[in-house]
Amino acid sequence: MRNYKLRLSVMSPSEWFHKLKNMTKPRKKHSLPLYSINTTKKRKPSSESKSLPYSSTSYFFNRSRSRTSFESRILQISPRNSLHNIQSKRKTVYKPSPPSSSIVSAGFNKTFHQSHDSLSASSNLKVISSEDDIIIDMNNRDFKKKTFKEITKFDSTEKACRASNRTKETHIPHHLSVKVSKEKEDEEEDACRTKKKHQKTLVSSGRRSSAKSPRIKLRARSPRIQVSPRRSKSRSQNKQILDSFAVIKSSIDPSKDFRESMVEMIAENNIRTSNDMEDLLVCYLTLNPKEYHDLIIKVFVQVWLEVINSTFASK
């Protein structure tokens, strides 16, 4: 029993030996990308991919296989092909900008011709567009006519605006009538201004004279003044008073001037009765402002007393 050795080969069957041999050899692990693992399940085995005879478990994929959608996207995004593809697939669709009324000037036609030449030169490019896009042929004659008509319209409006703002630069045949009407209006305005100035000078002169010295109406010699005198026995004396006219005098001492004028009126008209004296007083009160009424009454009383005293003395 000592010389007998127990071996594993005696216990295991002979069919397992080739498996044990293969277990000792390391398997070759091929690192595939993540996107290829997902595509291998869905992809059908092609006739081009052939398995090698000496390996029953390993499969090698051919590089010339069809590209999937994911790979094509990655290749499109690659920096080498991205610029080329984007430039080739860029849509060259030209749409005319709406004309703005605020940008109307003399240099507008030049800029339009330059932009039009650049557009016509670039119109030979290939256009890749969808059904919703609006494609405009810049070489079309109708389009050119429309654009040039619009530009001429803007030029005409510009000229009209300038003519309305500046009447001197216009060459319209009716400008003479406009000037004549303006001259007439200017003459009328000048006449109105002169009238107003004349009226202002008259009013101001009257105001200045009244401000310098108070004016007193001393004699009532105007028949237009409506005086309500009491009827006296001597109608001739009343008519003489009413037919007289008023004299306006600027005085420094109004009481003295009133006294002198009253004495003069009494002497000229030969006023002796009380009714005539009352009529004279009414004339002075109506012709002079209220400021002098108290002074007129005071002076009148003094003159009347003097007249009475003189009549008694003469008798």
From Swiss-Prot:
The protein's matches in InterPro entries, at most eight in alphabetical order, are given as: DNA_bnd_dom_ovate (IPR025830), Ovate (IPR038933), Ovate_C (IPR006458)
Instruction: Report biased composition (Polar residues) as residue ranges.
Output: 201-212
GO biological process entries: negative regulation of DNA-templated transcription; regulation of secondary cell wall biogenesis
Which Pfam families does UniProt cross-reference here?
DNA_binding_2, Ovate
Where does the protein end up?
Nucleus
Signal peptide per UniProt: none
**Disrupted gene: phenotype observed:** Moderate irregular xylem, but normal plant morphology.
Taxonomically, the superkingdom here is Eukaryota
Location of the region described as Disordered in the Swiss-Prot/TrEMBL record:
27-54, 159-238
Domain (OVATE) spans 247-306
Alphabetically list the UniProt keywords.
Nucleus, Repressor, Transcription, Transcription regulation
The tissues where this chain's protein is expressed are given as:
Expressed in root vascular cylinder, root tips, xylem of stems, flower buds and siliques.
Molecular function GO terms recorded: DNA binding
GO CC terms: nucleus
Q: Where is the composition biased (Basic and acidic residues)?
A: 159-172
Q: Is Protein biosynthesis among this UniProt entry's keywords?
A: no
Q: What does this protein do?
A: Transcriptional repressor that regulates multiple aspects of plant growth and development through the regulation of BEL1-LIKE (BLH) and KNOX TALE (KNAT) homeodomain transcription factors. Forms a transcription repression complex with KNAT7 which regulates secondary cell wall formation.
What further fact does the record state? Answer: Plants over-expressing OFP4 show kidney-shaped cotyledons, round and curled leaves, small rosette size, late flowering, reduced fertilization and round seeds.
Whom does it interact with, and what assembly results?
Answer: Interacts with BLH1, BLH2, BLH3, BLH6, BLH10, KNAT1, KNAT3, KNAT4, KNAT5, KNAT6 and KNAT7.
Mind telling me which NCBIfam families this protein's record contains?
A_thal_3678
Listed name of the protein:
Transcription repressor OFP4
